[in-house]
């Protein structure tokens, strides 16, 4: 188990960036969010209700770690965290795509299973030309599915539990 914490939380606002935009639409910084099993983050515009037919359930929550952001900043300069389209930023440097199948547990009992790496969208090139290509191959974090409901707050302790290991809430 690897200890971490929630460095920042963001939700999608009224709309996401579109190809015709000249700058990425920033996400909204928040201090607390409700993770709902099988649905995602309740306050987010992309929250899925359990009855949404045909929705891919691996994409409920987007994650990135501070180390990944810092590596991109070393190449592209300062990056506003609310423009990289990740809902949860975790402290540390853990390269989340290497942890597919692992579970992130939070002090509140909320839990997310990492399901796949994220593919960067065109909006990354709006932050800095070439950033989208630099984020290929898992350099934009990972996607996760909510497996246990609970409140997640900025600064909250969390843990990454390897795939197959027993999952417990952080104490």
Predicted regions: what they are:
Residues 54-57, 130-136, 160-165:
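Short secondary-structure transition/capping segments
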């Amino acid at each position: 188990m690897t200890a971490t914490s929630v460095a920042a939380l963001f939700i999608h606002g009224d709309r996401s960036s579109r190809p015709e935009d000249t700058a990425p639409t920033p996400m909204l910084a928040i201090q607390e969010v409700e993770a709902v099993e099988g649905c995602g983050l309740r306050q987010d515009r992309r929250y899925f209700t359990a009855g949404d037919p045909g929705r891919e359930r691996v994409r409920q929550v987007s994650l990135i770690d501070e180390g990944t952001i810092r590596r991109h900043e070393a190449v592209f300069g300062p990056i506003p965290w609310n423009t990289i389209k990740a809902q949860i930023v975790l402290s540390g440097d853990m390269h989340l795509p290497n942890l597919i199948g692992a579970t992130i547990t939070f002090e509140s009992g909320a839990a997310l299973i990492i399901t796949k790496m994220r593919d960067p969208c065109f909006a990354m090139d709006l932050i800095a030309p070439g950033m989208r290509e630099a984020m290929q191959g898992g350099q934009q974090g990972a996607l996760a599915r909510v497996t246990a409901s609970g409140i997640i707050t900025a600064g909250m302790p969390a843990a990454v539990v390897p795939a197959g290991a027993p999952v417990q809430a952080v104490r």
